[in-house]
């Protein structure tokens, strides 16, 4: 079965002024849509059509070598963006079990944000910054290049930030740190909490 572009759970302008409407439209309707189209083309006629995107990206080594790069890039792009849209909200509230765990691990939410921001700002070129739950149930901040996802390494992402230039350049140009600062105003902590609970069951 072909993968489909998911609908956004809010309007394109809902995250203004932090993430602008035009960026959201291009990011979702053009960039994400392209990943879906290219992923479907790559896996057409293979057993991968019957697997979930999580199964595919978590087991890239089992993908046939002739389509592995296309699946890694476009499958990762589809998975990452499908999660990213859910991790954003115009009604951000800093509460929940995961907030308490973050404070335990990093000392304060602000210290965590600083460490996450360093990882996001320090990602050379295109990529993502993530808060993940590792195999032992511990929280960790990691970054991945391009459209790689931490599940390939056996880690469960519960918060992610797209630091590809297409995610912020229209509004922030080369000022990636300003985009990272703005991100905290639209984080869907309810979703992060839900993902944390599922990952630590």
From Swiss-Prot:
EC numbers, comma separated: 1.15.1.1
Cofactor(s) this protein requires: Mn(2+); Fe(3+)
Keywords: Iron, Manganese, Metal-binding, Oxidoreductase, Stress response
PROSITE patterns in the record: SOD_MN (PS00088)
Keyword rRNA-binding (UniProt): no
Residues where Fe(3+) binds: 27, 81, 162, 166
One annotated GO molecular function: metal ion binding
Signal peptide: none
Cofactor note (record): Binds 1 Mn(2+) or Fe(3+) ion per subunit.
Binding residue positions for Mn(2+): 27, 81, 162, 166
Disulfide bonds: none
Transmembrane spans: none
Cellular component aspect of the GO annotation: cytoplasm
SUPFAM superfamilies: Fe,Mn superoxide dismutase (SOD), C-terminal domain, Fe,Mn superoxide dismutase (SOD), N-terminal domain
A Pfam family it matches: Sod_Fe_C
Record field: catalytic activity: 2 superoxide + 2 H(+) = H2O2 + O2
Function statement: Destroys superoxide anion radicals which are normally produced within the cells and which are toxic to biological systems. Catalyzes the dismutation of superoxide anion radicals into O2 and H2O2 by successive reduction and oxidation of the transition metal ion at the active site.
Additional remark text: SOD activity increases in mid-exponential growth-phase.
SUBUNIT field: Homodimer.
Family: Belongs to the iron/manganese superoxide dismutase family.
PANTHER family named in the record: 37S RIBOSOMAL PROTEIN S26, MITOCHONDRIAL (PTHR43595), SMALL RIBOSOMAL SUBUNIT PROTEIN MS42 (PTHR43595:SF2)
This protein's name: Superoxide dismutase [Mn/Fe]
Organism: Staphylococcus carnosus
């Amino acid at each position: 079965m072909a993968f489909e572009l998911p609908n956004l759970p809010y309007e394109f302008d809902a995250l203004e002024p932090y993430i602008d409407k035009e960026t959201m439209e291009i990011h979702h309707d053009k960039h994400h849509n392209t990943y879906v189209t290219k992923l479907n083309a790559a896996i057409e006629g293979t057993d991968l059509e019957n697997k979930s995107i999580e199964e595919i990206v978590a087991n890239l080594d089992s993908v046939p070598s002739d389509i592995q790069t296309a699946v890694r890039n476009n499958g990762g792009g589809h998975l990452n963006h499908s999660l990213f849209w859910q991790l954003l909200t115009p009604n951000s509230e800093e509460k929940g079990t995961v907030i308490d765990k973050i404070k335990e691990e990093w000392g304060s939410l602000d210290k965590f944000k600083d460490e996450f921001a360093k990882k996001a700002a320090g990602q050379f070129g295109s990529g993502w910054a993530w808060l993940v739950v590792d195999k032992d149930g511990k929280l960790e901040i990691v970054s991945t290049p391009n459209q790689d996802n931490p599940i390939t390494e056996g880690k469960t992402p519960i918060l992610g930030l797209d630091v590809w230039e297409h995610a912020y350049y229209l509004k922030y140009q080369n000022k990636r740190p300003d985009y990272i600062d703005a991100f905290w105003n639209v984080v869907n902590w309810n979703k992060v909490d839900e993902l944390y609970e599922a990952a630590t069951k």
